[in-house]
Amino acid sequence: MFRFTTAGESHGPALVAIVEGLPAGLPIDVEQINHELWRRQQGYGRGARMKIEQDRVEIMSGVRHGLALGSPLALMIENKDWENWNAVMAVEPTELAPEKSRRVKRPRPGHADLAGGLKYDARDLRNVLERASARETAARVACGALAKQLLESFGAQIRSHVIQLGGVPAKPLELKFEQIAAIPEEAPLNCGDGEAQREMMELIDQKKAAGDTLGGIFEVVARGVTPGLGSHTSWDQKLDGRLAQAIMSIHAVKAVAIGAGLEASSLPGSEVHDEISYNDETKEFIRDTNRAGGLEGGVTNGEEIRVRGHLKPISTLRRALRSVDIDTKQEERAAFERSDITVVPAAGVIGEAMVALVLAEAMREKFGGDSLGEMKRNFEGYREQLRGY
């Protein structure tokens, strides 16, 4: 079993998470978690909140002397902005003057504001947007960093890159894993095409001046994942379905593609399916192409897993769209909350975390074990089985 849950509001005192299922003896590198949190905050076009928050994780339980205990791991990420919101977000009953309450009553089109308000009968839409905020993904990235550390113990690596922002595509769209890993961390948009990246930045500047926002496409690539994770036997065990749900759960993602994705629907089968051959030296079945994106029948096939997330533009616009005041029912401009112009590079980092969490769950299902040593013995036994197939 492997699972995680997060809690916390955008302007509350902290984000917290609990991760269950890490095997005892797994080395836990706190600075690696902090580095992933730093990566999430980078990217040209981010808002002022990123200048306030300097995310650092504090592990509260489940680790001793740098090793996982096998018990639930609890972690916390403080919200530095809490000091500016402690009255508005107080736990205790508090009477605030209307001008200080920061009540939200003009829902933003495209956001959870109105749908959440209707569902939970919230007359202050702040009760919805505080949890619906993408700030929650900081906790997911921390959990994903732990999942990455587990996967790395078994030779798997995960990276992401931006392949399109607005209407500007990178060229080529598909990079080798080594090329993606070689993109400098200081690259403003985590894009492997320098010329396209400059065009993207110019477009961001234009939309910022116009009070608008931008979406785009990121790709997550996982290398070194063993064949046989997931299952063809039941719909909810198919790994491609689980990965798609995980990526779709990221704020603003409206479509997910695996491998050739949407393009495959317009091509003949002879140009889509990856022909199989056998390597006598490595004792492995291999493919010269990877249009399946590393998954066939809901099961990993040993090739790189390639998943793309398509993001809509952020729903908080400085040039606000038309909306309705939920009190008066009169037409108004939507509320404005401090926000970004685009988050595609950060969404890629979050995508890495979600892919890592799904793969870690699949690894624990497949290989079990209470300790890392036991899990590795099970893994090696399976690898020996594959070599004899």
Label the model's feature ranges.
Residues 1-389:
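Generic N-terminal targeting/processing segments that precede catalytic cores or assembly contacts
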